[in-house]
Regions:
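Compact, glycine/acidic-enriched structural inserts
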Residues: 163, 167-187
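Short linear proline/tyrosine/threonine-rich motifs used for host-factor recruitment
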Residues: 46, 159-161
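A surface-exposed partner-binding patch
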Residues: 1-144
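A short, compositionally biased
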Residues: 134, 155-158
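Short, low-complexity intrinsically disordered segments
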Residues: 86, 111, 119, 150, ...
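Short intrinsically disordered terminal tails
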Residues: 1, 187-188
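Short, surface-exposed beta-strand/loop micro-motifs that present aromatic residues
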Residues: 146-153
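Glycine-centered tight beta-turn/hairpin loop motif at sheet-sheet or coil-to-beta transitions
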Residues: 143-146, 167-168
Length: 188
């Protein structure tokens, strides 16, 4: 278990990483525009996708799990994330508010993805953990099954973040390391 002082320091570091991610949007947008147009997307289409929208902070006290009606209290880092911004869309990444988690988790498409992961991807988060130990953190593409999940291993500990994109899985010890990865400074 991580000590209180260490967690407070990590939550402050997370705020720095979130700020960096927010303020480096212009660089990511320009890189995205070049890449998207190189694959045949028109500049107008690419610009329509290359947006950042950050909603106001809303009170969040718990995170719903995939188990209907069950939630987990926010860890210190999740509390820092929700104290920093509300709904957050950045090009393809969409960091969700709890009500959005509930909406997406109830869709047939998402439930089918969870079922497929449990049946066909050995050692994936849905394969290894029950719905009461999984939450949805962000979505890059619902259609393609690009999701970042929170994995609640032990009560009182920071949840891990497991990201799925195409046929790849990326695991992070906690939210701070996930944001470092988003910023291109991964330690894992």
């Amino acid at each position: 278990m991580i000590g209180t002082d260490t967690l407070q320091g990590m939550a402050l570091e997370l705020q720095v990483e979130m700020s960096h991610y927010r303020h480096q949007f212009g660089v990511r947008r320009n890189d995205f525009l070049v890449e998207a147009m190189s694959y045949g997307m028109s500049e107008e289409e690419a610009r329509a996708c290359a947006i950042q929208r950050i909603g106001p902070v809303v009170p969040v006290t718990s995170m719903p799990t995939l188990a209907l009606g069950k939630s987990r209290p926010l860890s210190p880092m999740l509390a820092a994330r929700y104290q920093y911004a509300g709904d957050w869309k950045d090009i393809h990444e969409h960091l969700l508010l709890p009500n959005e988690v509930l909406r997406i988790a109830a869709t047939e498409q998402f439930r089918s993805w969870i079922s497929d992961m449990r049946n066909y991807w050995v050692e994936s988060a849905p394969y290894r953990f029950g719905d009461d130990r999984l939450s949805l953190l962000s979505v890059a593409s619902e259609k393609e099954g690009h999701f970042s999940m929170l994995v609640w291993r032990e009560p009182g500990e920071e949840p891990e973040v497991w990201t799925y994109a195409s046929q790849h899985e990326y695991r992070f010890r906690h939210l701070l390391h996930w944001f470092k990865w988003l910023n291109g400074r991964s330690e894992e």
